Amino acid sequence: MKIKSIVLSFFLVIFFSVYAFAGDPATGGTGLTVAVAANVQYTFEEIKAAFEKNTGIVITPVTGSSGKFTAQIENGAPFDVFLSADMDYPQTLEKEGFTYNSPKVYGYGTLVIWTMTGVDLSRGIEGLTDSAVKKIAIATPKTAPYGRQAVNAFKHYNVYSQVQNKLVYGESIAQTNQFVTTKAADVGITAKSIVLAPNMKDQGKWVEINKEAYDTIAQGVVILKHAQKDHSEEAQKFFDFLFSNEAQGIFKKYGYELPVKAQP
């Protein structure tokens, strides 16, 4: 128990030190710390580069599951902006008084089945009941919206009871992807934005899951009250940038469907 406490304290010190260096006006920093849902990880690299080039404002992204970020924000984590994998988590934070503005949808996500093995994907989700498929990776449904929608898709096709014992859970989409790329799982249910990333698009094979099989994945962004301490102007600039033609074009490139008014 003592070792665990020491390790946790160590990582907290590192996190807060990085944050302080990036954003403390006393050090001349003008940075933003942004909580980024794991499905946006690769997309965000281009968003970050474009924003920093346009404004000179430095962004420090932290990637993880939306549910865990929400819990961290509720417990005082110093994030300025939160890009969630759904609207539920940022709306919850708004109701609890942790946000500066109301959440806004920046894009709509798509589920895909992805494999690095010889598994036949021609039958889609129904094919995952085959005995050749031993392990199926999904993000943890409790904290990851993409994991919840994967379960909804299984239930839509009436195969959940047949695949339930095959499921292995990643803490977020990022760990789910690791299970796929290392072949620790035969297939994984992940985000289309991942398989379209430049460093992933030629790896393995994938198919989309029919959107009628799961709830619409509306992904929201919100400015958090913490930003008002030192970075209100920078946070607003970044929030607005996400809905610019340039940023929305990047989201589209990575397979996100765009809000109607944000079509570039």
Regions found by a protein language model. Name each.
Residues 1-10:
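Bacterial N-terminal signal peptides that target proteins for export
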Residues 3, 21-54, 58-62, 67, ...:
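Exported/periplasmic ABC-transporter solute-binding proteins
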Residues 9-19:
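Bacterial N-terminal signal peptides
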Residues 103-111:
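Short, glycine-/small- and polar/acidic-enriched structural segments
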